[in-house]
Amino acid sequence: MPSIDLKDQYFGCEIEMTGLTRQQAAEAVASLFGTNAVHSRSSRTYDPWEVTDNEGKTWRFVYDSSIHGSHRTGRQQVPIGDGDYKVEMNSPKLEYSEMGKLQEVVRTLRHAGAVVNGSCGMHVHVDASKHTPQSLKNALSIMYSKEDILFKALNVNESRVERWCQKVREPMLEKIRKLPSNTTMDRL
């Protein structure tokens, strides 16, 4: 059975931040790409700002109520109740070759004033379309075996582990491992 090469894997990121508004974040990234930031009225809840990159992919900056907003006053971050400072960036579907683009977007946001605090987090969505049931079983087993090391290295706040970034549960892992080898992706 062929393995999945990391370089063939599609992914997307959600990165939470504060220190700047959704509009400021979108305008900074639009400047990087030489395009425009657009205030989309598609959702009153998430109040999205959108930027299209040079490949026609859309980067979104949306409201996230879990973020504790702040803004810079001099050299200090000061808490602020203004929801505009609660920013979650949603990347488009990216290829491995676009990792540099993602890094440049993050650097651009940092230079524009983006910061993180204990309420901010990130996660990565991994495209499963090229996976097989066996490769997903393998990925889950690897993640389970390395979770504690990753969480410690990343200094993940325990309250976030409880609520937002829960670890793989052993009963679920065992259930997946016991699936027959002829299990289809639809069955998974």
What residue spans do the PLM features occupy?
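Phosphate/nucleotide-binding catalytic core
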Residues: 1-188
